[in-house]
A protein has these predicted regions:
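Conserved Radical SAM active-site core
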Residues: 4-105
């Protein structure tokens, strides 16, 4: 969102999806095969790929509109909490996925 010439990322730390799975399910499947990763996604994606199967959790236009209006009930998840969730789930790592990873910057 552009507010008076300053860009704000409304979805930083807002998780739209989270799942524990095998690294082989990710595009980096050859990195550390046999390990488990906690996959997390956030709303917002600058790509519009034909056939995207993550529209509701990546584009999330309704969710982003609610965030912009200050009407969202989505909770901010601090990095430390996300790391604890990964450790507690037995994950070997965290994969930022489901949307364009730069939304986490």
């Amino acid at each position: 969102v552009n507010r008076n010439g300053t860009l704000y990322n409304l979805s930083y730390g807002i998780i739209s999806a989270m799942d524990l799975g095998r690294i082989e399910e990710k595009p980096v499947r050859h990195y550390r095969p046999g390990t488990k990763v906690l996959s997390v996604g956030s709303y917002g994606c600058s790509f519009r790929c034909g056939g995207c199967h993550n529209l509701d959790i990546s584009w999330g236009t309704d969710a982003l509109d609610a965030l912009a209006r200050g009407e969202s009930r989505a909770a901010f998840v601090p990095p430390e909490t996300l790391v604890k969730a990964a450790v507690n789930s037995g994950a070997d790592g965290i994969a930022f996925t489901y949307s364009e990873p730069a939304v986490w910057l």
